[in-house]
Amino acid sequence: MYLQYLVLSLFSTTVYGGFNLNFDSKGDALENAAIDFTGEDVAVIKENERESFGITDGPLKDACGKVSGRRPDHVWLYKPTLWGDMYTMYNWREVTRTLRPIGARVVGKEQKPTIVSSQIYKNRSSRTVKMNGKISQEVTNTVENKWSQTHGLSVTASMTYSFKVVEASMEIGYTSEWGKEETKSESVAVGQEMGFEVELEPGESVEAVLSATKGSMIVDVTYRATLDGCCAINYNKGWKGHHYYCYPIGLVQDTGKLKKHVDIKETIKIGFYSDSHVIVRDKHAKK
């Protein structure tokens, strides 16, 4: 069996919340994989994030103008504003950026047998003997991640990962930063208990081969950033009896045909060794 049980979890810790993702695969069929994810990261939108959503000053004013019928002179997404703090004065909600994991799926897996180590046993005596041996070797399990463009999102939350592959005796955990690419590894011994006994005639040789299944699994995690709150609007000469307005950012995005969300993809590749076993064969055997 290629993989008995695999758990992948990640979460970030901030005052607003965090991410949790659990991946559980049993057996070979990808359709049997169960992937659960929860959590979010919420923060008032930063100035450098506006470009990601196409809501820099010009396009935002144009979109607000389509909502009201007249392009405003000033528009804000968060406090402070001119002429006092309109968000506090009128109890308006600043525009916040919410980031959530919206999907995770296995996009590939591979398994192939590989020779981890081998050892020659030869009877150099003049009589038949029984030889007992054990063979083991250290191998490296790895986890590596890559990100698509993070689109300038200012996410300060830390990402805490935990990977567990029971069949491969793999358990890797670490804390990282949003958008950071890195590789983590652990060394484990395979074949420690793989003992064997063989009877050799005088001058006879055998080769003990420690083999294992080298496996890899690729998981794509998709995060989506959306906006909520209202745009604070000012008309210097007033408009329809008022100077100040609050337009919901969703309405502005829809009316102005602006980008409604930003998606970021993280690709995680897990590499491990499992199903180790020893084969004792004639020294000159090809397989």
Curated annotation (Swiss-Prot):
Processing after translation: Contains 2 disulfide bonds.
Where is this chain's protein located in or outside the cell? Secreted
| MF annotations from Gene Ontology | toxin activity
**UniProt feature coiled coil, ranges:** none
Q: Where does this chain mainly localize?
A: secreted
In which domain of life is the source organism classified? Answer: Eukaryota
Q: Which residues form the signal peptide?
A: 1-17
Q: In which tissues is it expressed?
A: Expressed by the venom apparatus.
Q: Which UniProt keywords apply?
A: Disulfide bond, Secreted, Signal, Toxin
Give GO cellular component annotations, separated by semicolons.
Answer: extracellular region
Role played? Probable toxin.
Task: Tell me its family.
Answer: Belongs to the caterpillar 8 family.
Name listed for the protein in its UniProt record: U-megalopygitoxin(8)-Mc8
Q: What organism is recorded for this protein?
A: Megalopyge crispata
Species lineage, top-down? Eukaryota, Metazoa, Ecdysozoa, Arthropoda, Hexapoda
